[in-house]
Structures are given as C-alpha cells and as structure tokens.
Design a protein with these regions (language model features):
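Glycine-rich, Lys/Arg-enriched anion-binding loops that position phosphate/diphosphate groups
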Residues: 123, 134-218
C-alpha cells in the first residue's frame, strides 16, 4: 500500500521529491511497499529532510544507508555497478532491501538467503539497472517505449484535472505489478536451472527426461 500525505507528520515513514515523478523513485516506493505500508511525503524542503529519521530517497543530497538516505544527485556520489551503470534511487533501495523483498515475495516458494541473493541480482540486471541507467542519462535513446517511459506517462497532464499525488500512486501500482512479476520470473528461472542441473547429474546419456515442462530457465 502506498499513501501520499499532503503535509508532513509523525505518520510519514518515507520521503521522496515532489512532482514530476520518475521511474527510479516510483520503483523505490513500490519496493518499500512490499515490506511495509508506505506513508509517503513528497518534498524538497531540506529542513524537513534534515530533521527526519524516515527513509529518504532520490532527494536530500545524501547517500548513507545507516541514516536511511538514498540520494544520487549530489556531488561526489560514486556508487557504480561493475559494468559502469551508475546507481539511482531504485538501485540503491534495491541493493539495501532487495534480498528482504525477494524473501517476502518468494516466501511461498521457500526462498532462502542463497536464492534470494541470486534473485536480487537477476532482477537488478533484468529490470533495475535499466531504470537507473535511463535516470542517469546512460540509457538507450530512441522512440521505443521503456518501463521508465511507461511510469513517466503517469505524470499529471497540464490540461487534465489530475492530482499529481494520485498519479504517483497509480504509477506505483504499475511498478509493483512489474516488480513482483520480475521477481517471480527470476525465482522460476533459478529453480528451473537447479532442477535441470540435478537431472543432468543423475542421467546417463545425452537425453534427459523431465516429468514436467520447465520453461524460462535459459
């Protein structure tokens, strides 16, 4: 659940910036909503940001996981993936909370720490790094629609009677669907790989026979 508050109060447990929204903080919000009901306040007021102990992301000019600060816009920010893709708020939140999120979403499949680490890495590579790349100007340019552009399309239109915060929540709902599906795909793929590997190890000959179709493991 994501609820956006018009004023700051002690109920607020997360802070990000005001409209317009981008895919990185929308997905960060969707991630956190897996773990707890998100009571969000959108602001750029540095005084509020400096004096809160809530999770702050994509705003505030500070990266410090211990203090629950996850911005990437500040001078000197140096969190970069091995392939050169710079972290944005989606990636920073995922790196901090991804395994916990995966274990929550994969509880019914018995996801343990080892698999959660694999799944978190899979989802980062398949989904989140692309969101971060586009937010940081490292993404592909062109006319094709991306996950990031779909999320951006939910910003309020100037000639429609739309509330920016309601549009933000709608975008978060879309992001949640995409994120949860990607986690399920990752779990399915990794479980499939392990089943295939186990069958190969006990099979003599060049052909393995499975008792059910296992797709999406390549």
């Amino acid at each position: 659940m994501v609820r956006v508050h018009k004023t700051y109060s002690e109920v607020v447990n997360t802070i990000t910036h005001t409209a317009p929204h981008h895919a990185d903080e929308v997905f960060a919000t969707a991630m956190l909503s897996v773990l707890f009901p998100v009571e969000l306040y959108r602001t750029r007021d540095q005084n509020i940001i400096n004096n809160t102990d809530t999770i702050v992301y994509d705003v505030g000019g500070e990266f410090d996981p211990v203090r629950k600060r996850f911005d990437h816009h500040q001078k000197g920010f140096s969190e970069v993936r091995p392939d050169g893709i710079i972290y944005a708020s989606a990636g920073l939140i995922w790196r901090e909370y991804g395994m916990e999120i995966v274990k929550k979403l994969g509880e019914a499949k018995g996801v343990d720490n080892e698999m959660a680490l694999e799944v978190a890495s899979y989802v980062d590579n398949a989904l989140i790094r692309g969101i971060d790349a586009r937010d940081n100007g490292q993404g592909e340019k062109g006319d094709s629609m991306s996950v990031s552009s779909v999320i951006s399309s939910y910003n309020a239109l100037w000639d429609e009677d739309e509330d920016a915060d309601s549009c933000f929540v709608s975008a978060c709902n879309i992001a949640s669907i995409i994120l949860e599906r990607e986690v399920k795909i990752a779990i399915s793929s990794i479980r499939g790989q392990k089943l295939i590997k186990e069958q190969i190890e006990v099979t003599k000959g060049a052909v393995i026979i499975m008792d059910k179709f296992i797709g999406g493991w390549l």
